[in-house]
């Protein structure tokens, strides 16, 4: 995974803080986070980063799928994540790795992002923390795309998704 719109907004290069015992994802940070919206020249650096990793491992049999971007639009970013989402798919397609590409859908209300994710993913991946009935509805909806499908995040006891 190259990019992530989840969790902590503050990050720095170098050694990271120690994990906090008993705190879920205490050290997880967004990447590139708000820097994406405040730095005018970040895209060339991100493109070089993505292409370098993909070129290095594009035929590596240990990799079964490239999940390019975790939860685009999270942390209130919404459609501000569209340019990076479109770009990461474009950069990956230019490298043409042997493995399939995907970005998991996770919020049905982010229709513009979901459209790009579903149109460009070779394998449909999705996150679902709902109960069994709602999860089945999501599966039934995604099955209409007639592509392989993987649930890549699941289960929240508070949502009865056991």
Tell me what each language-model feature is.
Residues 1-123, 127-134, 144-145, 158-161:
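Active-site mouth of glycoside hydrolases
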Residues 149-156:
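Short acidic/histidine-rich active-site segments
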